[in-house]
Amino acid sequence: MSGHTGGADQRKGTPATRLDWDAGTYDRVSAPQQAWAREQLQRLQLRGDEVVLDAGCGSGKVTAMLADLVPDGHVYAVDVAPSMVEHTQQALGPRVSAFCQDLTELTLPEPVDAIFSNATFHWVPDHPRLFAALAAALRPAGQLVAQCGGFGNIDRFRTLADEVARGGEFAPYFAGWKGPWNYARADITAERLSAAGFTDIDTWLEPRPTTLADPEPFVRTVCLVRHLDLLPAELEPSFISAVLARAGTPLLLDYVRLNIVARRAGEAR
């Protein structure tokens, strides 16, 4: 779910708390991300005995699905958010080995046969560095299957949130802030993957509009989580309410997903 420390602002909290997530709530509200992950997992070609990496494991719901695909293998789960790593390890126990790491600085006990990632790469500012780190973690001919936010992702919602952030009592807290997201284009992503040593590359954008029946906990935990980092606690409820009022009901999020399928260059051993 989260993969890099460089995107968040430093005006609230310590580096650890500032970059953390509410793992318990995310585990409950992330049904859209889990549904997309189930689709993407079908793209992996696995026998069942591979060593695989979940790059940006979040609360571990998707990691559990991945572990089911390799009953005779092992899953490494990496996330930059301490609460997510703790939640994943507690939920899955010996089925996985979870590490709190920046994805651009991966250090795993061994090379992996495949890397899977869901709803994470758009949190990483430096995609060339990310893809180089992933390639280094893979065995030759290892698979990369990923999906993240792509160019145009929730543009309408982010525009509304920016309008609220620039107004009234909220404005001083967002002065000069541009947000941590990196919603990349498919063609540029393919070029970066190739430069990092990947081959058999396929990248494409996919609109996935999503309506939320209970939007408040979702936007608080997912869409506005980094906005709220900048606000004092007493302003958080009014900020969320103002954004949701502008967005209207039912809340339709104009998600655009960037799909990635590739292999590390080289011959399988």
Each model region followed by its residue ranges:
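A short acidic, Gly/Pro-enriched loop at the edge of an enzyme's catalytic core
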Residues: T104-I115
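Class I SAM-dependent methyltransferase SAM/SAH-binding core
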Residues: L53-A55, S59-L106
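A short hydrophobic/small-residue beta-strand
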Residues: L144-V145, D200
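A short SAM/SAH-binding and catalytic strip from SAM-dependent methyltransferases
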Residues: A114-H127
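Conserved class I S-adenosyl-L-methionine
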Residues: S2-G48, K61-M65, M84-H87, V145-G168
